């Protein structure tokens, strides 16, 4: 059986374990956390299903066939902001395979390099002389912020349908910050260890990156009372 296979290669599943000097079963440990998971809801935003209805997001890791509420993109982002501004945090699931995701540099960005109209005068003059590859090399030095893609529902959908946006990783959104240009970022707690970057395991994901690369978010239901 599958259980026998796991027992052979991973060891027998313990019925009890000790944490901080106290013995638990999996169920008693879950109960000790004080979380009622019925108070949490999963939200997503895609155009190939009707808004304001539930559907199964078509990603390999959704093996439980979980259904998520489909909201317009701006409303999904609004819910995340409301949660973070009102004492809640947000569970985030999304794509971390892009070069713009740099845990080492503590940032995740979605740079706009095809159009240079929004660049400052100095950067625009330099970037107009570069091809797209050279522009990306400059941006991915992560030395300063550059303009980012305006992510519409259509842009987001194209990334999902082309498998450019995939179901890679889950992290914890804990706050909101802005850079010197006023660009919004989501303060994000990663699970890859506190020693692997100089930010204690955190990074800042830009608004454009989150709009483009989110598969779904999970929030407390009270994060939706305003809509």
Residue ranges and their predicted role:
Residues 1-91, 96, 100-105:
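Core regions of eukaryotic protease modules
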Residues 69-168:
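Long, positively charged binding patches that form subdomain-scale interaction surfaces
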Residues 97-99, 178, 192-193, 210:
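Short, glycine-/Ser/Thr-/acidic-enriched flexible segments
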Residues 161, 166-193:
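Catalytic nucleophile-His microenvironment captured as a short glycine-rich beta-strand/loop
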Residues 195-206:
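A short macromolecule-binding patch
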Residues 203-205, 213-220:
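Long, low-charge, small-residue-enriched segments that form tightly packed helices used
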Residues 225-227:
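Conserved small/polar residues in nucleotide/adenosyl-binding loops
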């Amino acid at each position: 059986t599958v259980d026998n296979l796991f027992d052979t290669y991973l060891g027998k599943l313990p019925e009890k374990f000790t944490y901080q000097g106290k013995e638990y079963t999996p169920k008693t440990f879950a109960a000790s956390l004080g979380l009622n998971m019925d108070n949490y809801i999963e939200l997503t935003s895609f155009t190939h299903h009707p808004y304001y209805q539930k559907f199964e997001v078509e990603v390999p890791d959704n093996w439980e066939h979980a259904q998520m509420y489909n909201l317009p993109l701006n409303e999904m982002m609004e819910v995340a902001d409301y949660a973070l501004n009102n004492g809640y945090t947000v569970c985030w699931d999304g794509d971390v395979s892009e070069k713009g995701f740099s845990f080492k540099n503590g940032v995740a960005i979605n740079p706009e390099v095809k159009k240079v109209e929004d660049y400052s005068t100095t950067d625009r003059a330099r970037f107009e002389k570069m091809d797209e590859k050279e522009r990306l090399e400059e941006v991915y030095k992560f030395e300063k912020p550059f303009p980012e893609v305006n992510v519409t529902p259509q842009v987001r959908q194209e990334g999902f349908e082309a498998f450019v946006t995939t179901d890679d990783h889950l992290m914890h959104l804990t706050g909101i910050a802005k850079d010197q240009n006023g660009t919004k970022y989501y303060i994000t707690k990663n699970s890859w260890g506190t020693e692997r970057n100089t930010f204690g395991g955190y990074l800042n994901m830009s608004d454009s990156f989150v709009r483009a690369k989110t598969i779904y978010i999970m929030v407390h239901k009270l994060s939706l009372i305003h809509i």
